[in-house]
Amino acid sequence: INVTAGGDGIKSTNDTDTTKGYTTITGGEITVKAGDDGIKAETALTIDGGTITVSESSEAFEGTNITINGGTLDVYGSDDAINAASTTSSDIFIKVTGGDLKVAVGSGDTDAFDANGDIYISGGTIDVTAQSAFDFDGTAELTGGTVTVNGEQITQITATGPGAGGHGGW
């Protein structure tokens, strides 16, 4: 699937029905160039496999809950690459259990991983290129996987950048 969009590339939203707004990707090849969000799910975005490239976007992945269990992902966001936020839920998180992720963002007040809640990384290989790698309002746990930020492997997640701990938005 190749998507070029002036707004969101792939979008699953429904503000009024909590049983909707889910996107699950289990395989295939997806390429997105978007003027706004690359792939957005109002409630939950789950990636279990596939090859996903988001070469242009404001935010490559956006949702209330973002879970990455596998796949080969190469994503770029001019604002935040992976953004978990919500105006209606307090259960907000980014969870990475597997996969091969290459995550990059533009310069300025931008974040590779931005959660208005929690960040959990327990597996996978993550290569981040960013001025600010992690921004979160809740807790952050790194219990497995390999995470490299600007060429340096890290063993714990700390909030970084000018908006650390209180950033992100819907």
Language-model-derived ranges and their functions:
Residues 1-170:
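A composition-driven surface/loop motif
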